[in-house]
């Protein structure tokens, strides 16, 4: 009863070793409920899953069963869109846990610092960066191998392409990208790993015939480090979703199209404020007008790369890379006598007139004499 009589409530709380906030809480209970209010009270949430109407619980379970690989947050967002109001996320989690419809969440690996041709920046708008890869192959129910090509807009998470390919050759992948560019326009950059046909792991700046074509279209190249898939972590997450939700099962193109439709137009994403990718993505303003016959270099000397990857300079054949065969490069004179070698907006290296050699931009000077020409 001292709490009702003291003039120094703070000192009284210190005497009993409790905070002032706790002291006021107990005094309020005493004034409101008498001695009965001093008993320990239940800590269960006031809005508990047990208090939800049976129809609400059934609808939660039904939505989860229709989207088995979605978490409670996405299921709640879907419920909210359908009914206009929804219980708390924790209520959804408890209901789905009791129904045995949840799985432990895996810890994400931290993204590491990326390597060559990597800007270090993430897309801030649609079409700034597209990501591409081949989903690891599996066999469908008919025993046929399926290895889809996946293309994704980094900012909006919009899956631009999920295509079962006849093979992974350059010609097949280029034809797929030509159709994609015609539909969606051109991105600012394309991020890939260092595998074929997107890159040549030992070639000049990793250039392949496919990525050289991208550069000719004015598209920048971004790549992760060899052996570090987390450098393209968002795309790897997409592949985990595909593996979980589509394998094993039909690998027909119709099934892939249905999955892409749901992912883009129905599935909410936390990183997008629970919006769907289709609500964020829009076509590129850079239209695709076909492949250029060649590149022009105003103010530079142009040299066509031959079938063996060489150019002629001062009567001397210099090996550049066979990935650029048929394309022209630009030679820009420097004040020290050297010449920069450019392909589009990509600096390839330098011609040193004193040694009559080409110095690659991706090899340190001390390594130049130790490397043999590659693609």
For each feature predicted by the language model, list its residue ranges.
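Double-stranded DNA-binding cores of transcription factors and transposases
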Residues: 1-31
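Mobile genetic element proteins and their domesticated derivatives, centered on retroelements
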Residues: 12-13, 23-26, 34, 59-60, ...
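Basic, flexible linker segments flanking DNA-binding modules
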Residues: 35-131, 137, 205-208, 276-288
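Mobile-element integrase/transposase regions
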Residues: 85, 94-158, 166-188, 215-216, ...
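A structural microfeature
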Residues: 160-161, 349
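Acidic/histidine-rich, metal-coordinating catalytic segments
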Residues: 180-204, 225-227, 232, 274-277
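Charged alpha-helix within mobile-element recombinases
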Residues: 209-289, 330, 334-335
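C-terminal, beta-rich DNA-binding module of retroviral/retroelements integrases
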Residues: 264-375
């Amino acid at each position: 009863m001292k709490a009702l009589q003291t003039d120094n409530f703070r000192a009284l709380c210190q005497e009993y070793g409790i905070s002032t906030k706790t002291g006021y809480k107990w005094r309020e209970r005493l004034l409101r409920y008498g001695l009965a209010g001093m008993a320990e009270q239940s800590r269960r949430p006031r809005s508990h899953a047990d208090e939800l109407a049976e129809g609400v619980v059934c609808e939660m379970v039904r939505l989860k069963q229709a989207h088995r690989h979605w978490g409670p947050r996405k299921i709640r967002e879907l419920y909210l869109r359908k009914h206009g109001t929804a219980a708390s996320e924790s209520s959804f989690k408890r209901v789905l846990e009791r129904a045995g419809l949840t799985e432990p969440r895996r810890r994400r690996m931290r993204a590491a610092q990326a390597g060559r041709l990597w800007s270090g920046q993430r897309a801030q708008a649609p079409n700034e960066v597209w990501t591409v890869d081949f989903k690891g192959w599996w066999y469908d129910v008919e025993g046929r191998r399926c290895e889809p090509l996946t293309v994704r807009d980094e900012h909006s998470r919009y899956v631009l392409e999920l295509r079962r390919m006849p093979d992974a050759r350059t010609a097949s992948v280029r034809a797929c990208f030509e159709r994609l560019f015609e539909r969606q326009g051109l991105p600012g950059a394309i991020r890939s790993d260092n595998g074929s046909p997107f890159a040549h792991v030992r070639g000049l700046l990793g250039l392949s015939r496919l990525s050289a074509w991208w550069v000719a279209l004015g598209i920048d190249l971004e790549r992760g480090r060899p052996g570090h898939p987390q450098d393209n972590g968002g795309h790897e997450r997409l592949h985990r979703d595909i593996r979980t939700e589509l394998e094993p099962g039909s690998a027909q193109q119709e099934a892939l199209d249905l999955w892409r439709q749901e992912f883009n137009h129905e599935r909410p994403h936390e990183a997008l404020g629970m919006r769907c990718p289709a609500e964020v993505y829009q076509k590129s303003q850079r239209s695709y007008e076909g492949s250029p016959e060649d590149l022009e270099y105003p103010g530079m000397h142009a040299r066509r790369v031959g079938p063996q990857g060489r150019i002629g300079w001062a009567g001397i054949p210099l090996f550049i890379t066979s990935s650029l065969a048929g394309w022209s490069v630009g030679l820009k004179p420097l004040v020290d006598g050297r010449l920069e070698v450019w392909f589009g907006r990509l600096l390839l290296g330098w011609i040193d007139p004193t040694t009559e050699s080409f110095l690659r931009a991706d090899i340190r000077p001390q390594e130049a004499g130790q490397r043999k020409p590659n693609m």
